[in-house]
Amino acid sequence: VYARMLQNGVEVKGTSGRFLADLARRYQVHLVAGINEKVSKGYGNGSLFNSLLFYGPDGNLLNHHRKLMPTFTEKLLYAAGDGHGLKTADTPFGSIGGLICWEHWMPLSRQALHMQNEHIHVAVWPAVKDLHQMASRHYAFEGRCYVIAAGQILQVKDLPEMLPLPETLQKAPDQYLLNGGSSVIGPDGAYILEPQFDMAEILYITIEDWESTLRERMTLDVSGHYFRPDVFDFQVNDKRNA
């Protein structure tokens, strides 16, 4: 199974990476994609990285983040990432950043993005269950930013045929193993779009009140008037592991 995952991994500068860049360019959108990343040479060439790619509407790669720490059993599959991707990308509608799954429980990872005046945060999860919703709402409130919490949809029938399945699952091809839960949260921590479960549809949301990211910072600004640089020394090693 691991060999198959490695074979099907995405090389950022390879065919699959170029395909994602072409999609962003063709549809003139900012595209954020979570991938199982493989590299052909150097550090991690026999491993996978849990990665997040940000493309601009011109197809250029704006940011490439590798999850800092594989979580629990993920350590069987993934190598550790680095701080190179702990940054935001400037867009016409504000700066955008993102974290992967349990990185949202790492306070310093959150602070690294808060310090860069993040306006839109992409929180990617396997499925956005209750605790993940809580982490996403907390991030929005703490960072005074909009959060797009994205959850995967996976049904039994989507699994590779090579995987042996218990009889109960064989008889339920439409059963959800990952049931989504995607949502959109405002800078006050309130839902703009309630969690959407058990559906595989494209959701379109219009955000017009961009000033709310400023208004909410009157009461809480964790990188400004609610931060104590005289007490805490904050720095990030943003070097890419070669």
Please identify what each model-predicted range represents.
Residues 119-120, 146:
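Short acidic/polar active-site loop segments enriched in Thr and Asp
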